[in-house]
Design a protein with these regions (language model features):
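Acidic, glycine-enriched catalytic cores built around paired aspartates
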Residues: 4-60, 66-118, 125, 129, ...
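Secondary-structure transition/capping motifs at alpha-helix termini
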Residues: 240-247, 479-485, 507-516, 538-551, ...
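Structured, charged N-terminal subsegments at the starts of enzyme catalytic cores
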Residues: 143-147, 154, 253-270, 323-510
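Short secondary-structure boundary/capping segments
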Residues: 274-276, 412-414, 421-424, 503-508, ...
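Extended, highly charged
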Residues: 2-250, 272-362, 407-410
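Catalytic core of soluble alpha/beta enzymes
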Residues: 521-573, 577
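Hydrophobic faces of well-ordered beta-strands that scaffold small-molecule active sites
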Residues: 407, 487-491, 514-522, 554-558, ...
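Active-site-adjacent "gating/activation" loops or surface patches in catalytic cores
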Residues: 262, 468, 483-484, 497-503, ...
Length: 1011
């Protein structure tokens, strides 16, 4: 069963399905029941092959543009209709989803639970011995109880498919259901059939609640996987240390979440949202503890004393759930945030019932230990099982406390700087050399004399500074949700030591410094270059040094997404590992090897944001390289590694229990593999090569980021060709008319920017600069690729990016804006009306004057692409060598991807032709016809159509002119019913735009990630 090719099976099932693929409930166009998508796909594929073969003789032709024009001609001659195109898009998107399931299965490795049990057991056995000798139990206990790896779930906007499909993806990859039962071939076909009846787009109106609930599902599966892992540890240890196995409380892994607690760049998350999301995480954990106790209750029925004590715990957990639910439902009420009386009421309720809320696990631990003494003395039939169940419960409480995961909050450095500015008279840059020391000394003096203050929920309501309010929320979470579990305090874009020191000041002010771990995030170009200096300044500050020694660790976060956007991903990954080593060296040089270095590498599933495409094992090696681990060992710096799994794309590994367990096994293999030796790597032995590699790629990407023509490329297409894939809105800074065709790329976040590049067929963040570096010395480049394990791992991502990129695709999209192409096309079109519309499009695009700008970027990227092509496919290859050869994906799959691009270019052409058919109108409400068309040309169709419907209404109530005492036969323009325009232009624009966005979903499936 596991060898089934799901992509091919999906296509064969769609061939056998004789009904239309598209239900009328959500189809964009009237369903054509006679469509044969299999035949249509073959016809267009033959067209593409024919165009390619003829194009070898014509260096100026473009196979994707030619395919799009061929589709347009078929539409013009009625040999093809929009309904057929929509159905074909559905087919290709479903096939690409099958490919995604196949890829996930391969990416995760061994999925069979019993085989993974054996792998984990062997890892535990290996930990218990050194040099073929069993180590003392005390040493083993220290090893097994260390926290060495953290899994962090985030709410990044990568929810690119319906949640049901996301769960189907996990189930198909494992061929198991959530209950662990195997999926039969018949059941798999039913899943596929349901998928091709599903609209290929994310769920509509994604909210923070939606993201949070999905993250809870993932966390529950992760806990199940961890409990299975811990059970395997106890079973194995019982065989190695039979007298001591119940004395261990293994940790190794920790679970974290920032879903609902990340307010960096978000003004839509209130303090009540954050508090309530944390409370929900507690409620779910209490439910797990209660269910465990209920299970134990059934096994101790014969011993009334033990049963009575178990029932006491059960009663306390149920009572805690009831009281916490009362708070949760109150805070969840609509309008709560503005209802002062309700806030006062629930605040008093919390204060008066604090003991019943259960805010720490000390009492539970004490009760369980008392019961364990009785169990050991008892003659219970299921004594061994009861001991195991209680031990697992204790391990769970030790690791999870009162929440499915540990809390990580995040805000932006600017929010902290603003909050402290008045107190230290901060003006301008905190790192300004003329004031830097003054600012640092001022914050230190504040810490010298700070005294903790008391706050309540009323204090939160009256505080205007976001940063201070956030500290207050954390204080209340400790007070009323969980007193014990530490909170990570992440500071985004933390380029200055003063900012982290400010966080410490506020932590002390609100009496949190013993419970939170401040973690600066280094992701900008400046931070990656100077982050170690920030840390050096902090560790030399007496207050921060004392704080670190007290916490026993220093926490930092390194961000691959923005680093990849600004520097290029190949340069970013090397810059990040270099920074991590520099920070470790700072700790060693400042005699701080007694504290642990916690590095949270935040990255996404896409290669542009730090995800490695080959396997989960390769991904872990990619972000946490062996050379860095070697240097940390030399400096005696203990490492705790954390990685992020961002949004829906990240949760995919944890929406099926067997998949979660497999993922956890791969991570355990990475962390616990014995005798991990570093083999000498030519990349580190010859640092000049690596430095020049980074600098070349960095130079290319920083230049292109500041290039207004690159900005134009991103802005013309923009996020309007994408469905919204998260609760965080993606809007341009300026959104009016023709003049907004150019802006700066930094105004777009990493995910949408990467998404746009994916959709344009050019993964520039991973490719840019590689060609330039290749040109310098191809032989040396090849030598390092063959001899350096690290360099090859980085370049494998480049090869993957190349496989899903095509310079002709980019050119086809760009040439949609070429007035010359439209004029040439108009002269070869028999339909006079359509020809005239093409001339109108040409005139329109001439006035926009954008094509030449896009072409300049194309030429720059073309040079990069061709150098990489020559390296991947061989310099002897000429012309348009067949797609697929020498690439990491086969030709058939790549051709399906190119078909999707060709179809969408044709859709864009149809959109442009419809745009110029809008009736002329005088400016209304400050909006001109040119501005509306400008919105359409940059694919902001919903907003444009909304404006048009206001100007050209349908079915407007008619005024009876006979009631005014005198006759009138005048017909006002307002009395005209624009039903024809509605049906032939406005609805068509919306439908075509939706189809274009569904293509985006399909392309996302092909590549395997959003952005």
């Amino acid at each position: 069963m596991t060898s089934i090719n799901i992509r091919k099976l999906s296509h064969s099932e769609m061939d056998l399905y004789r009904k239309p693929l598209l239900p009328e409930t959500w189809s964009c166009f009237p369903v054509d029941k006679e469509i044969d998508t299999q035949s249509l796909k073959k016809v267009l594929q033959k067209d593409l092959d024919r165009i390619r073969s003829g194009a070898e003789k014509d260096p100026f032709s473009n196979s994707i543009t030619m395919l799009a024009l061929d589709i347009s001609r078929r539409l013009e001659k009625k040999k093809l209709n929009y309904s057929a195109l929509e159905a074909l898009i559905q087919r290709l998107a479903v096939g690409s989803f099958g490919l995604r399931a196949d890829r996930l299965k391969k990416y995760i490795g061994e999925i069979d639970r019993k085989k993974n049990d054996k792998k984990l057991k062997q890892l535990i056995i290996n930990l218990s011995s050194e040099g073929n000798k069993q180590i003392p139990f005390s040493e083993f206990k220290k090893k097994i109880e260390k926290n060495i790896f953290g899994i962090v779930l985030t709410a990044h906007p990568t929810f690119g498919m319906p949640s049901k499909m996301l769960e189907d993806l996990a189930n198909m990859a494992t061929m198991t259901k959530v209950d662990g039962k195997k999926i039969t071939l018949k059941e798999l076909k039913v899943i596929i059939k349901n998928i091709f009846k599903t609209e290929q787009r994310p769920d509509k109106n994604i909210t923070l609640n939606y993201e949070h609930l999905l993250s809870l599902k993932a966390l529950k599966n992760l806990q199940l996987a961890l409990n299975s892992f811990y059970k395997q540890i106890i079973i194995t240890v019982s065989e190695i240390y039979p007298n001591d196995y119940l004395k261990i409380t293994p940790t190794i892994f920790s679970l974290h979440t920032w879903v609902g607690y990340d307010v960096d760049g978000r003004g839509d998350i209130s303090w009540a949202d954050t508090f309530n999301k944390r409370l929900k995480v507690k409620l779910e954990q209490l439910e797990i503890y209660l269910e465990t106790i209920k299970g134990i209750e059934k096994t101790v029925q014969e011993d009334k004393l033990i049963l009575s004590k178990v029932l006491i715990i059960k009663k306390e957990l149920k009572e805690s759930l009831e009281y916490n639910l009362e708070i949760y439902h109150t805070l969840d009420e609509e309008g709560f945030i503005d209802n002062i009386k309700l806030i006062q009421k629930i605040s008093k309720f919390m204060f008066e019932n604090k003991e019943k809320l259960l805010t720490n696990t000390k009492k539970l631990f004490h009760q369980i230990n008392e019961i364990l003494i009785l169990v050991n003395q008892s003659k219970l039939k299921l004594k061994k099982k009861v001991l195991m169940d209680f031990q697992l419960l204790k391990i769970g409480m030790n690791n999870f406390s009162l929440g499915l995961a540990r809390t990580q909050v995040r805000l932006n450095a600017n929010q902290l700087n603003n909050a402290i500015s008045k107190e230290i008279d901060l003006h301008g840059d905190p790192d300004d050399p003329s004031n830097k020391s003054t600012y640092l000394n001022s914050v230190s003096k504040l810490i010298d004399k700070v005294s903790p203050v008391k706050i309540n929920f009323g204090t939160i309501l009256t505080e205007n500074m976001n940063a201070k309010r956030f500290f207050m929320i954390i204080a209340q979470m400790f007070k009323y949700i969980d007193q014990n579990q530490p909170v990570r305090f992440l500071i985004a874009e933390c380029d200055f030591a003063m900012t982290a020191l400010t966080a410490l000041y506020f932590a002390k002010l609100f009496n949190l410094d013993k419970k939170i771990d401040i973690s600066p995030l280094f992701e900008t170009e400046k931070a990656l270059a100077t982050g170690h200096l920030v840390v050096e300044t902090l560790v030399k500050n007496q207050h921060y040094r004392k704080y670190l020694l007290q916490r026993g660790k220093i926490c930092i976060q390194t961000g691959f997404s923005d680093a990849g956007r600004y520097l290029g991903q190949p340069a970013a990954v090397l810059s990040i590992e270099n920074l991590q080593r520099k920070i470790a060296k700072v700790l060693a040089d400042n005699k701080l090897s007694s504290i642990k270095l916690l590095i949270f590498d935040t990255h996404g599933e896409s290669i542009g944001r730090g995800g490695h495409p080959v396997s989960l094992e390769e991904r872990l090696q990619y972000i946490n390289c062996s050379y860095t681990r070697k240097k940390l060992d030399e400096w005696n710096i203990k490492l705790i590694q954390e990685v992020s799994f961002q949004g829906g794309d990240g949760y995919q590994y944890f929406l099926n229990p067997d998949l979660s367990y497999a993922a956890l096994t791969r991570i355990a293999e990475f962390c616990l593999r014995p005798n991990q030796k570093f083999n000498d790597d030519i990349l580190y032995n010859s640092p000049d090569f690596g430095v020049e590699f980074v600098n070349t790629i960095k130079q290319f990407n920083t230049n292109i980021m500041d290039n207004p023509n690159y900005a134009a490329l991103l802005n013309v297409f923009g996020s309007n060709i994408l469905h919204s894939s998260g609760s965080r809105a993606i809007k341009r800074q300026n959104d009016s008319g023709v003049k907004t065709l150019v802006y700066h790329p930094s105004q777009t976040r990493a995910i949408p920017q990467n998404s746009i590049l994916q959709q344009l067929g050019m993964l520039a963040n991973s490719l840019g600069g590689i060609g330039k570096f290749l040109r310098k010395d191809p032989k040396k480049f090849e030598e390092y690729y063959n001899k350096s394990e690290r360099f090859k791992r980085i370049l494998d991502s480049v090869k993957y990016a190349f496989a899903f990129s095509d310079i002709e695709v980019l050119k086809a999209y760009i040439d949609s804006f070429d007035p010359g192409m439209w004029l040439s096309w108009s002269t070869r079109t028999a339909d006079i009306e359509r020809s005239n519309n093409m001339k109108s499009v040409a005139n329109l695009l001439e006035s926009f004057d954008i094509h030449w700008r896009l072409n300049k970027v194309y030429r720059e990227l073309h040079q990069e692409y061709m150098e990489i092509r020559d390296w991947v496919l061989g310099r002897k290859s000429k012309g348009r060598i067949a797609v697929g050869r020498g690439r990491v994906i086969e030709k058939e799959i790549r051709d399906e991807l190119l078909l999707m691009h060709g179809i969408r270019v044709a859709i864009f052409h149809e959109l442009f032709l419809l745009s110029v058919q809008i009736p002329k109108f005088s400016d209304q409400a400050g909006v001109s016809r040119d501005e509306v068309i400008a919105k359409l040309i940059r694919f902001d169709v919903p907003e444009a159509v909304k404006i048009l419907r206001t100007i050209f209404p349908v079915g407007k109530e008619k005024i009876n002119y006979s009631d005014y005492g005198e006759k009138s036969d005048y017909i006002s323009e307002k009395d005209i019913n624009y039903t024809i325009e509605e049906n032939t232009i406005f609805k068509q624009l919306e439908a075509l735009h939706e189809c274009a966005k569904r293509v985006s979903t399909g392309i996302t499936h092909f590549i395997g990630s959003v952005g």
